[in-house]
């Protein structure tokens, strides 16, 4: 038995300079686990509740001392003496202790920090890397990254409505080669933007945030940069979008303020289909708003046979929300963010449910990140085959790529880069 003897939380800073919670778990054999919790900028209405202090005198109300106190008090007292390898029991006890549907009493950030730290401590106690401890002998798929190289929407201060323009190195034969390809395109894009007179400041996730007029202009710069780096758009490197459309869905219309367009669900679906017809776009995240179920079903009927349609705000990593989508025929993929649901067990349940019904899963970071690289291990543990963890700059993003490179080295010849194999794109 790997008995939990201490749980300690502290308030640290994330990549945006906002407070977040970090948790250390210690076991009776001396094993330890540490986890830091991320936070999003564009958040779904159905996400688990992130506990913030609301004290305007500290961090403009964004402090997390209440969550820290919950961990160091109630949660520590409840879990002391438990076997850390009983992950589902640990998570269930915390959910029951909280007693609310969305983890709003203790805070999903408090619960998640403990959940992940317990898993890490148990992995160390078992003398296994986290991906192997969670995924077993079959954990060996290195995910194809979605690399966010142009930022818009809530992730940047520019007029571009679509939140993320990403590249996917689909022809790479390894994660290390995929990272190299992405980095080369990233640097080519920087020069291309600079030569065109645009600034090369970066947004929350490390992508560039130039003052562009439209999605077409953003994609045009990326296509040029792929070619400038020596690659073939669509063959070596495909494109992916995160529309984050809930952010601009107002009164039943999709308000593309940057492009001066006000579109119905059907019109916005056609707008996206037009982009897919002209560019090698394999995946679109949040192509419709979180409550526009009819729009989602129509978009899936329109594009679902040839484009991966990823539900983020739609599903919020929640198996119950995903079950509704499965029944309705909405989307064909789920974005997986551990802090949307608040425990490791529920996260794994969402991935399992998706795979069971032929949906893909994309492991994802948040815009407010830390140096914690847990999601890299989770991507390999679940064999989901795709990861979304930002651009090729900022240490909070690079930490995940570097961890994947280490895992690939550990796996050796049994490791396999996913490439196109795990993408629902016809």
From Swiss-Prot:
One of its GO terms (cellular component) is extracellular region. SMART domains: Enolase_C (SM01192), Enolase_N (SM01193). Signal peptide: none annotated. GO terms for biological process: glycolytic process. The active site is at residues 205, 337. Pathway: Carbohydrate degradation; glycolysis; pyruvate from D-glyceraldehyde 3-phosphate: step 4/5. The keyword Magnesium applies. Its cofactor is Mg(2+). InterPro entries: Enolase (IPR000941), Enolase-like_C_sf (IPR036849), Enolase-like_N (IPR029017), Enolase_C (IPR020810), Enolase_CS (IPR020809), Enolase_N (IPR020811). Residues 32-53 are annotated as: Disordered. NCBIfam families: eno. This is Enolase.
